Design a protein with these regions (language model features):
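A short core secondary-structure module
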Residues: 164, 168-212
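Amphipathic, small/basic residue-rich leader segments at the start of a protein or domain
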Residues: 5, 9-105, 122-126, 130-133, ...
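A short, Trp-centered hydrophobic/proline-enriched beta-strand micro-motif
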Residues: 134-142, 186
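Short Gly/Pro-enriched turn/cap motifs at secondary-structure boundaries
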Residues: 131, 146-149, 173-176, 190-192, ...
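Glycine-rich beta->alpha junctions and the first turn(s) of the following alpha-helix
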Residues: 19-29, 91, 95, 210-299
Length: 299
């Protein structure tokens, strides 16, 4: 019986043709990301974090590498890479600078992916291209003061005024809050319809009534600009709505599902970077006559 089971498992493995080795392209992306993290991000990362300084120039260089629109079709200015390449790049960047990687993650996983997957051709040409090339940075606006990231409990409203929506409300804890130029905002259009009355709108910096509010003084990832956003009678053209009327909730759920891949890769990178630093320190620090890594509690 055991032999039959082994033979069965062998046949399954052979038929699936499992291959967990990285391709040459993926290895090249990983190496490029590692080199960039070590040589460009690492020298100033402590200063940026201490002073809450957004890595403006560093993000521009990330864009030059094609890392701000990694999975976007080249016809829209992206790099056309696969998800694994994106994950590998996120890990390497996050090992050194989580502030740079979270900006990269939001732009790739949430904003670029959301517009490419569900936006109109006009929206892709107008908004996706500059986001994928890194000319502009995007932000995803869902969380609210009294609702957190519960997409079904939106207090921000987008009232249908015929040719446009009138947007009012507040969004909190928005990554890339002050550095972004393009914002995906989730808002309630029809309260009676519940989650089926929610829309996703593309907001541009400079729209009248749109204000970037207070910056959060965070414990970590301080180089990332996390802000409150205020919308006071902002007129949003109907052309800026993503998908059909009432598609906003589904859009948010789909986009967040993809976004979890980037954030998981970031968490893995942060953990790996922390381990590498701790290991190096344990070989330098001495206590009781020997390096601390030789003590049982650490070894």
């Amino acid at each position: 019986m055991l032999g039959r089971i082994r033979l069965f498992l062998f046949k399954i493995k052979k038929s699936i043709n499992m291959n967990f080795e990285l391709t040459e392209e993926q290895l090249a992306v990983k190496e490029a990301a590692r080199d960039f993290a070590q040589n460009v991000l690492k020298p100033g990362v402590i200063d940026r974090d201490n002073n809450q300084r957004f890595p403006v120039e560093e993000i521009k260089q990330l864009a030059e590498l094609g890392f701000m629109g990694m999975m976007v079709d080249p016809k829209y200015g992206g790099s056309g890479m696969d998800t694994m390449s994106y994950v590998l790049a996120m890990e390497e960047i996050s090992k050194v600078d989580a502030s740079a990687s979270v900006c990269m993650s939001v732009n790739n996983s949430l904003v670029c992916w959301g517009i490419e997957k569900y936006g109109s051709e006009e929206q892709k040409q107008k908004f996706l291209v500059p986001l994928a090339t890194g000319e502009k940075i995007g932000a995803f606006c869902l969380s609210e003061p009294e609702a957190g990231s519960d997409a079904t409990s939106q207090s921000t409203t987008a009232i249908d005024m015929g040719d446009y929506y009138l947007l009012n409300g507040t969004k909190n804890w928005i990554t890339n809050g002050s550095s972004a130029s393009t914002y995906l905002v989730i808002a309630q259009t029809n309260v009676e319809l519940g989650h089926k009355g929610i829309n996703a709108l593309i907001i541009e910096r400079g729209m009248e009534g749109f204000i970037v509010g207070a910056k959060e003084d965070k414990m970590g990832i301080r180089g990332s600009d996390t802000h409150t956003l205020l919308f006071n009678d902002v007129k949003v053209p109907k052309a800026n709505r993503i998908g059909e009327d009432g598609f906003g909730f589904t859009f948010a759920m789909k986009v967040l599902s993809g976004g979890r891949i980037g954030i998981a890769a970031q968490a893995l990178g942060i953990a790996a970077g922390g381990f590498e630093l701790a290991l190096a320190y344990s070989k330098q620090r001495k206590a009781f006559g020997k390096e601390i890594y030789k003590h049982q509690a650490i070894a």
